[in-house]
Amino acid sequence: YSYDLDSFMIDLDSSTISMVYTEVFNYDIITNKKINNSDKLIALTFDDGPNYNTGKVLDVLAKYNVKATFFVLGSKAKDNKKILKREYDSGMEIGNHTFNHLLLTKYKENVIKDEIDKTSSVIFEVTGRYPKLLRPSYGVYNNIVKKIGNMPIIIWDIDTLDWKYHNSKRIASRVINKVKDGDIILMHDIYSATANSLNIIIPELQNRGYTFVTIPELFYYKEITLEKGMVYGYAR
């Protein structure tokens, strides 16, 4: 049997759940994957791309058949449309990370709106789909940002600090030593060390019984409804 729920069509049976977007988006949120209700879930998220290192990240994700969520900068997406298209065509979720990585809380409403809208337009131009998720620059927001963004705001509960360390083993250890079911991991696809760290993180956590999912998948399977203007750092 099926339920029509907030732009999703969800097909259920007794033990597994599969989900696809309706034809409005023509986008399969789960690609050749079924998840048991008892699985431990984790969501990798990547900020500040795309750039030339994003391809390395996508290569590793493909190697392990992992889907993730990319919060892209409009300014970089505009200059790297082929990489953005590859993200989307690979089944990744694409979110909005503003256009110029401004600290939105320091700016007037018209600037905030422009930063978000321009990025959404670039994403739509490349993918044919407007983003459904917002991650403000630096993860900083206020009530004005929440209102103007008009999307669920996704932050994180594990920061790999990959922007600081640029060391794949150290990046991996920050995830492996802290991870819990329902975690959202912050990474940056613009660094080669981040791509390399995935070769440590993914097989280790898969061996521990974790399944890697996109943000919409994570919250769906945790039975949490993502609401516009609300802020989420994990799914538990």
Protein language model annotation of sequence segments:
Residues 56, 78-79, 89, 102-233:
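Catalytic domains of cell-wall/extracellular-matrix polysaccharide-remodeling enzymes
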Residues 1-43, 59-68, 181-236:
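Terminal accessory/targeting
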Residues 9-107, 111-122, 130, 220:
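Active-site beta->alpha N-cap acidic-glycine motif
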